[in-house]
Amino acid sequence: MQRKPSQKSATDKLFNHRINEKITGVSRVRLVSDDGVAIVSFEEALRKAKEENLDLVEVSADQELHVCKIIDYGKYKFELLKKNKEAKKKQHVINVKEIKIRPRIESHDYEIKKKHAQEFLGKGDKVKVSLRFRGREMMHSDLGMKVVYRMIEDLKEYGLAERDPIQDGKQIVVIINPK
């Protein structure tokens, strides 16, 4: 029975740097330190890092000369985690909220559905307005279209329809994007 390869977590992917003696197969490096940028031997770069009680961290291995920095790796990891956490906070996931209505909806029910749609659009979510026909209501699809167009018109100041309402079988659907 074979083992599954282990899944790397997000933090493992963030910290895939080689440090100190783990940097192998390199004779010369481009060293970035407080003194500036210099091309030195790997041993000299490691010695400088040890003298300053810091770590030699490989930042980039893409070029012919590997780029290394002399930094406190623990502090560097903490800063990267902090930046990553801040970036996640700033992300906003757009959800699609659905409002279901009927062709012969009462005015009070319509107002409540409209109010919910306004709240969703105010939060930055998309709203999918779907009007469903039952039985013989299909014969009066124009009545359903009027209700959907009325909803689009009432929500104009909160969002705009992606495209005109589409009748798909027994329902009419339109998606409204927030402004």
Curated annotation (Swiss-Prot):
One of its GO terms (cellular component) is cytosol. One of its GO terms (molecular function) is translation initiation factor activity. This is Translation initiation factor IF-3. IF-3 binds to the 30S ribosomal subunit and shifts the equilibrium between 70S ribosomes and their 50S and 30S subunits in favor of the free subunits, thus enhancing the availability of 30S subunits on which protein synthesis initiation begins. The keyword Cytoplasm applies. Pfam families: IF3_C (PF00707), IF3_N (PF05198). Keywords: Cytoplasm, Initiation factor, Protein biosynthesis. Its main location: cytoplasm. It is found in: Cytoplasm. Belongs to the IF-3 family. The keyword Cytoplasm applies. It comes from Leptospira borgpetersenii serovar Hardjo-bovis (strain JB197). GO terms for biological process: ribosome disassembly. Monomer.
